């Protein structure tokens, strides 16, 4: 299973990083960030942006994936930033998983330096260490995957909130949704891709949205490959969408950009 391989590699990488910067030291750095935010009365913009009227769009910085291989050969993050700014993306999702998605922390650090747009750190979080790391890197939100964390979801959710990070909790079926609701998770990402076999169906959002309380923020993830798909998923009543591959493949397509902007204007 691809997911198992990703998690195994992640465990090795996290242990290696703990030797470079000890956990207590990193936690201290993260708390220092939080204290500065409190002093500056900084409000995390993540939820506010996702709760705004109309459909919120999270655009992903995505070089590769296990199912599609390399998506963007010439991966220039400043070029992608300009493109996303031009088409009006609300939140940036930055992949930092190195082995299977070819992401890296530096992408997030660099974007944070030059943009005020809220950032979701997209990775496979299995250790509190990565929560502290996300804070130090400058993320506003982090991905927590219900199928990866299981019952540990509650403690990871709480720890993220302690560091003023908004967790986007990813689910794929009713059992995972029940887990997210048990821990009163506010932002629920419905992944239309099964992480075990990587099959995709937009019907997953259609089915699960009926079971999600109206006060939650619902984000549809994966499988949105056209403007038509966007219109379909919007009709299901989601609050937002997370799109990676479609945007990455259309970076130089002016016809797509015009169509997308038209879609946004009709939201």
Enumerate the language-model features and the residues they cover.
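Conserved, mostly hydrophobic/aromatic
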Residues: 6, 59, 84, 92, ...
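Active-site beta-loop-alpha junctions enriched in small/polar residues
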Residues: 9, 62-64, 97, 124, ...
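An N-cap/entry alpha-helix motif that binds or orients negatively charged groups
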Residues: 2-72
